Amino acid sequence: MSDGSVERGTKRAEDSLATHQLTVQYKRYYIDVNENTRGRYIKIAELGTNYKSRIILSIVAAKAIVSEISKMLALIDEPSTGEHAPKESSLIKSETLNVDGRKFYVDLKENVRGRFLRIAQMPMNPRQTRQQIAIPSDGIAEIHKVLTEYLAKFGEGHEQENTNTPKITAENKSFLFHSGKNDRGEFVRISEIKLNSGYRNAITVPMSALVDFRKELDNIIANQGK
């Protein structure tokens, strides 16, 4: 297994903050941390022979999945319970997560080639197909390690929702207000979520502009109906 990691910061509509590559058996995996107007997210891509699969995770979804993988690490190297390796895939442990209005399956499975981890992301639109990746046992610990490191470095202040997040609901939309801090300074992120589709958008307001931001909103409210 080989790997490489490089951090980079490009100033475009979408910023690439870090990427990690590793090769497991005949597959290549890329773990990318990106940021756009909706916030930060992690993309995990699997490249095999003539195919490519990927899943895209919000920071909060990535944290939930890493937590479940942590519980499965001890099972990776356990011997098979049967006398022979299974001819078809058998399920060892499975968890279902509901995060950001989406359902995720984290499954530790086994077949004739050995144990592997499958992470499946269900689509918001039922007419679309689900996205999933499969990681052989040789690469599970490495990917878990990289995800844990990236969440520690890039995840703070970018959790999109928790029980203490101020929330306003109006006209089939929810608005979340999250204050945080990163290497660029303090900020407030305002997320807009459409309740019927789960579509999410966000803006980030620097703390230094927050007073002026409030003044403009006060002016708009004061002039309503005039």
From Swiss-Prot:
Disulfide bonds: none
Lineage: superkingdom: Eukaryota
Gene Ontology MF terms in the entry: DNA-binding transcription factor activity, RNA polymerase II-specific; double-stranded DNA binding; double-stranded telomeric DNA binding; purine-rich negative regulatory element binding; RNA polymerase II transcription regulatory region sequence-specific DNA binding; sequence-specific DNA binding
Keyword Nucleus: yes
Signal peptide start-end: none
Record-level GO cellular component terms: chromosome; nucleus; P granule
Subcellular location(s) per record: Nucleus; Chromosome
This protein's UniProt keywords: Activator, Chromosome, DNA-binding, Nucleus, Transcription, Transcription regulation
Pfam families membership: PurA (PF04845)
Record note on disruption phenotype: Sterile due to lack of oocytes. Defective locomotion, marked by a 3-fold reduction in speed. RNAi-mediated knockdown causes embryonic lethality. RNAi-mediated knockdown substantially reduces expression of end-1. RNAi-mediated knockdown abolishes formation of endoderm in 3% of embryos and in 35% of embryos on a mom-5 mutant background.
GO process terms (BP): germ cell development; regulation of locomotion; regulation of transcription by RNA polymerase II
InterPro entries linked to this entry: PUR-bd_fam
Protein task: Probable transcription activator. Binds telomeric DNA containing repeats of the sequence, 5'-TTAGGC-3'. Binds to end-1 promoter, activating end-1 expression, which is required for endoderm specification during embryonic development.
Family from the record: Belongs to the PUR DNA-binding protein family.
Name listed for the protein in its UniProt record: Transcriptional activator plp-1
Species for this entry: Caenorhabditis elegans
Gene behind this protein: plp-1
